[in-house]
Amino acid sequence: MYTSRQLSIDDMKSVTSLFKSVFMAEPWHDDWSDDEQLSLYLGELTGQTNSLSFGLFEENELIGLSIGAVKHWYSGTEYKIEEFCIKSDRQGKEAGAFFLQKIEKEVKARGVKTIYLQTGNDVRAYEFYKKMGFEEEKNNVFFAKEI
């Protein structure tokens, strides 16, 4: 059975291991071989004053994580998920749906009105988020410029 809870500094070794195992594999193929760079990245996300991160556990094993932050905006309080993943061998087995529903309940109880996230439109996660009730923001685009 799954349980979820807010992550703490004591979970960072497991967070790092899970993050690498998911995002260095299909479909992402991100190169997180630089442990210092990964430590800095995760530290930036989890070290913010408004950081709010959750873990999904099966027994005592971390199998899912959501790293995000609460943002206060004119239209209400938001939770921006920066990173969300489920251990590869648990994907497609309702773990992600269970976890996201738990997160929704938790952040709603904290006054959050909207959850935001981004993903590629060419990966399975896109369909998962749509199934979970997320909609594309039609009037917003994501810009990038390599310098």
Where in this protein do the model-derived segments appear?
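Conserved GNAT acetyl-CoA-binding A-motif
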Residues: 100, 107-120
